[in-house]
């Protein structure tokens, strides 16, 4: 079910508590409370070192107080209490954050103390969800917080920070305002239909819709690069059996992740792992060797390998340079490169340490295959730094994309914008056909709702649940 959200008064909900820092041994940990009776609950268990009789409810916001937590007469810990008053807190509710000593036992004691005194254990992402529902952040910014927490590369982190700052929200807000204006003018016409009044000429509307289509199309197109920043560059290592694909995966990762054997066909299914080079994350996939086989399990592995190759942003074809008779394999390389024209393609010639005239063979290989070939020895770790640099250069500028413009990085946002673009296209076609105003207004309203879904102006409970369940309990 969807509903339109607007500016609502701050709602103080039931008090929730959670540990906001990772469980483990450390110097400090944070346990937070938020809700209508947060100050009352904190006041029952916390005594200030100075002026112990002054309740926290009487202290100003944005203040820190040293004191002790007690369970009755039993000392739990010495803590710092940070006070945040509604509406000037993260959730817009009254909040208290206790900074206690780190360690799982003491942290759990502090949390249990708050639960025993009236708090409910927060659900995953509930603090952020309350911030969204109380208008402190929009849905895009809430998602950006989650993306920043889960970021695995510098590029993903920087992109999340920019989204959290509100750049994409501002772009979509301006887009929504234009849509809202056109919708309002058309609906005014419907209200005054008996008077045959045009509040916006059809030519002006046509120009406006064309401009909106262009803006939406730019955002849709940006997803192709934006997803690489957050998801990483899908990099598939392909080639014949026993070319050294698993050894190369292990060498790039710096760990023994894949089983390595001299027996062909050891890898039966693909293996995925990530590594970061020059701030760019690569999602490496080691695939089963490409060959015709009657063995059922290996045949399925080859089928899955080809499926992953079709999804690759960067395809590394690994060739055993020490193997005799490369002519047939070169034909396969040429065919693969043509079949995966949308992917970056690099031939990696392995086992150069076993070939005396490796440089000559590499030149010949590059000429006959019609593409660049780079020589390595995965086992001896020769040429690996050069390979990593070449991989980064093939996606050059990716780490700076987040600085250049507003990017769409989420599949949810991408699909909503595609739907908005379809609705705008329908509206433009209806205009060309001189269709009824009501039909044009319907399509513009649909586009408006799709854009609203991204920022949370239009709320779908299933979407909210899917977004916030990914958060940790204390966020």
Curated annotation (Swiss-Prot):
CDD domains: trmE (cd04164), TrmE_N (cd14858)
PANTHER family listed in its UniProt record: TRNA MODIFICATION GTPASE GTPBP3 (PTHR42714), TRNA MODIFICATION GTPASE GTPBP3, MITOCHONDRIAL (PTHR42714:SF2)
Protein name: tRNA modification GTPase MnmE
Cofactor note: Binds 1 potassium ion per subunit.
Gene name per UniProt: mnmE
One Gene Ontology biological process: tRNA methylation
CC annotations in GO: cytosol
Domain TrmE-type G: 232-396
Keywords in alphabetical order: Cytoplasm, GTP-binding, Hydrolase, Magnesium, Metal-binding, Nucleotide-binding, Potassium, tRNA processing
Essential cofactor(s): K(+)
Keyword Ribosomal protein (UniProt): no
Lineage summary: Bacteria, Pseudomonadati, Chlorobiota, Chlorobiia, Chlorobiales
Keyword Magnesium: yes
Originating organism: Chlorobium phaeobacteroides (strain DSM 266 / SMG 266 / 2430)
Annotated InterPro entries: G_TrmE (IPR031168), GTP-bd (IPR006073), GTP-bd_TrmE_N (IPR018948), GTPase_MnmE (IPR004520), MnmE_dom2 (IPR027368), MnmE_helical (IPR025867), P-loop_NTPase (IPR027417), Small_GTP-bd (IPR005225)
Sites where the protein binds (6S)-5-formyl-5,6,7,8-tetrahydrofolate: 32, 97, 136, 475
Homology family: Belongs to the TRAFAC class TrmE-Era-EngA-EngB-Septin-like GTPase superfamily. TrmE GTPase family.
